[in-house]
Amino acid sequence: MFGRLAATAAAPAAPSAARWPAAAARCSAVVFLGAAPVCLFVFLVATLRHHPSDFTTFWDSGRAVLHGRSPYPSPQSLPAHPDPKTFAPFVYPPVAAVAMLPLSLLPFGVAIVVFLLVDLAAVALALRLLGVTDWRCYGAAFCSAPVFASAGVGAISPLLLLGVAAAWRYRDHAVRAGLLVAYVATAKLFLWPVWLWLVRTRRFAAAAVAAGAAVAGVLGAWAAIGFAGLHDYPALLGRLTRLVGPESYSPYALGRSLGLGGTTAQSAAYLAGAAAIALAAWRLSGDRRLLTAALGVSLLMTPILWPHYLVVLYVPIALARRRFSPLWLAPLAFWIDVSGWTSGSPARIAALLALTAATIGMALQRQSGRDELPVEQ
């Protein structure tokens, strides 16, 4: 009798005990994917004005255009040994300087907070355009080093992520897709391989719109500043690559850290990129995988690669898994090294490149055979 009573009393406890793992998982998700991003960005806002940032350069470039001055330094004015804490010359295409005019009208303290909010909104909107609705995916993204680094320095990388995501969403609308690809390629030159995605998927009208809009946009923006800096621009980019390329995380930097000369290291990166383009064109099919390959090639060929560039990896991740999965946690591994310049350390460079390659590889594997997301007409 007592045995039956004991069994009866213990029976209701079994379902309760079984619910503990699920409850613990939900609590962990709320803490690490909900509360942690909020704490990170509260800290960021509190310390925003105490750190030099890319946004300072953008704001100054907009002010220069506003007052009729060139935003570009001369190649000869760049220091032989740049200080990683203060070296941030404006070297973007002039479209970026013209785009910063509205923010340059604001006081710097106001403008930098506005731009931080724009960066965060761009990440959220990009994920939404990619069809992501699971809140845990947003939490994982906002906890990641690439997103935090982008917001922390005031980089335009989240806006590039948004541009690529929108190009995917409107990929079968020639004018919209073309204009969006032109925007990302002219705002940050290393993303030009995204244009090849349009060509490889036979979206020739969109590719033509992108090419025409890119040329018109760059020439129009340069005309707006009186073509200041146009003659020296190639030399400026070359000098910047020689100065800070070896300090970044690019394959070019890895080659330099292993003793290759500048020309040899850059040629090796270009050859590797060309081989990757040929392999992708031959072996891969489907919009998802080809866009992922285009972004991978972009990161492979750029001579300068900073951690915040890697925010574009959320396009392949979202195209592989629209709901939360371990793949969404992969970019958290980039927290192993977010200190900025590498000082030419091959171990640091190789570690970040290996994590990048692994993330792209996992996304490609999980994209295989999936149906395409709906196309916005």
Walk through the language-model features, giving the residues of each.
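Signature aromatic-anchored transmembrane alpha helix within multi-pass, membrane-resident enzymes
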Residues: 215, 325-337, 352-357, 376
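Primarily membrane-embedded glycan-assembly and transfer machineries that use lipid-linked glycans
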Residues: 2-177, 201-322, 336-338, 342, ...
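Membrane-embedded alpha-helical segments of transport systems
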Residues: 186-189, 216-220, 326
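Transmembrane helices and adjacent periplasmic/lumenal helix-loop junctions
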Residues: 181-198, 302-309
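Loop-to-transmembrane alpha-helix initiation sites
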Residues: 342-355
